[in-house]
């Protein structure tokens, strides 16, 4: 099994008197991560899977005495898919408060804020981490540099979900199953999501517009609804870790677009499954979009795994000057332009940005140099 970057961090945080919570989309390997953590431990452990109705009901209704009977002599309690339990925040608080010697390990496949379940009850009582599909750094440590280079096209098309990479011959079927609602099954359980067909249309529209600026008004017209519904559904898709937003950067220049936004997918394979397009790169018209989506998502994984805290944006002006992706850290900027064809790597960054802001680094990212920017 491929060792996840955050495993060392989790192991170092065990028995600090706080719950350890790992959130991320379904099937990114959260349960496997905890199994790997537990392989090296001998404490008695209780495993609870909240996809099972009886487990959900038991946890939701249990008082402190009933929790004591449930936990027994176990020193580690693993609660899987915890977001499915009503009032899960209070349940976890009750366990951490009443059983200080018990280590809680909790997974959630969507942001608990979907139902405002977690933050307030567990303030000061948790370590929380986000797990993504495999990062380039994790794959390099497991398989080496040559393998990472050789599998680039495959990852652009099929993505980096663990199950997909472990069963490449079944990648299409597995991705279709994952993208056809299983990935956002928690979202579909919400009362506020009354139109699953609309959600599917919206995902398709977003997949087609990857790397392009998005207008809620235009999306609403495309899928046949109103702006408010589009905004609400997009917010929920972000909280299920299917898509993420980049805002346009604007500060000093009057020509900068102030309300611009783009949406990217956490994983290329999910984006391609939504569009039902797994054609090889040589036969595609969207290679540039695949490359940009892939690099930005990999860069964000690398920043997260390395503990680099940056603000991420794109940049565009009313004069059509643009920068694909930029990061701000401590008042300095790193600029990135993505070019799949290395022969086009002589692009220059806009002089107006270079003169207005303090630029630490800039790079035209191609298949020849990308790895240096996405390893932890």
Regions found by a protein language model. Name each.
Residues 7, 12-25, 31, 36-45, ...:
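A cross-kingdom feature that marks ATP-driven nucleic-acid transaction machinery
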Residues 46-73:
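Short glycine-rich substrate-engagement loop in P-loop NTPases that contacts/grips substrate
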Residues 71-88:
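Conserved P-loop NTPase "ATPase switch" module shared by AAA+ and STAND
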Residues 78, 103-109, 130:
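Structural recognition of the conserved hydrophobic beta-strand(s) that form the central parallel beta-sheet
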Residues 83-105:
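Conserved Walker B catalytic segment
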Residues 107-111, 117, 133-134, 368:
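A short beta-strand-to-loop transition that corresponds to the Sensor-1 phosphate-sensing loop
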Residues 112-127, 143:
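Short regulatory helix/loop adjacent to the ATP-binding pocket of P-loop NTPases
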Residues 130-301:
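Interdomain hinge/linker elements that couple catalytic modules in large macromolecular machines
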């Amino acid at each position: 099994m491929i060792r996840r970057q955050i495993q060392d961090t989790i192991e170092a945080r065990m028995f600090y008197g706080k719950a350890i919570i790992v959130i991320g989309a379904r099937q990114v390997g959260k349960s496997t991560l905890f199994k790997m953590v537990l392989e090296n431990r001998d404490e008695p452990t209780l495993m609870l899977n909240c996809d099972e109705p009886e487990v959900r009901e038991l946890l939701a209704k249990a008082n402190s005495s009933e929790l004591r009977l449930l936990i027994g002599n176990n020193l580690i309690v693993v609660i899987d898919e915890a977001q499915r339990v009503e009032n899960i925040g209070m349940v976890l608080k009750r366990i951490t408060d009443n059983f200080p010697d018990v280590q809680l390990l909790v997974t959630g496949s969507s942001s608990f804020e979907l139902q405002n379940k977690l933050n307030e009850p567990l303030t000061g009582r948790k370590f929380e981490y986000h797990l993504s599909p495999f990062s380039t750094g994790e794959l390099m440590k497991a398989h080496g540099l040559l393998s990472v280079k050789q599998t680039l096209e495959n990852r652009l098309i099929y993505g980096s979900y663990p199950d997909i990479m472990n069963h490449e011959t079944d990648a299409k079927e597995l991705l279709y199953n994952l993208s056809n609602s299983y990935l956002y099954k928690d979202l579909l359980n919400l009362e506020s999501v009354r139109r699953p067909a609309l959600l599917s249309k919206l995902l398709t529209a977003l997949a087609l517009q990857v790397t392009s600026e998005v207008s809620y008004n235009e999306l609403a017209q495309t899928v046949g609804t109103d702006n408010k519904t589009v905004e609400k559904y997009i917010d929920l898709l972000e909280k299920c870790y299917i898509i993420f937003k980049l805002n346009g950067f604007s500060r000093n220049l009057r020509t900068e677009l102030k309300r611009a936004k783009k949406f990217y997918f956490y994983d290329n394979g999910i984006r391609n499954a939504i569009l039902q397009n797994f054609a090889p790169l040589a036969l595609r018209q969207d290679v540039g979009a695949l490359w940009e989506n892939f690099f930005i998502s990999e860069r964000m994984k690398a920043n997260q795994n390395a503990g680099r805290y940056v603000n991420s944006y794109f940049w565009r002006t009313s004069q059509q000057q643009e920068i694909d992706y930029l990061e701000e850290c401590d008042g300095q900027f790193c600029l990135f332009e993505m070019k799949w064809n290395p022969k086009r790597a002589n692009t220059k960054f806009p002089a107006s940005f270079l003169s207005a802001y303090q630029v630490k680094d800039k790079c035209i990212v191609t298949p020849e140099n990308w790895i240096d920017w996405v390893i932890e």
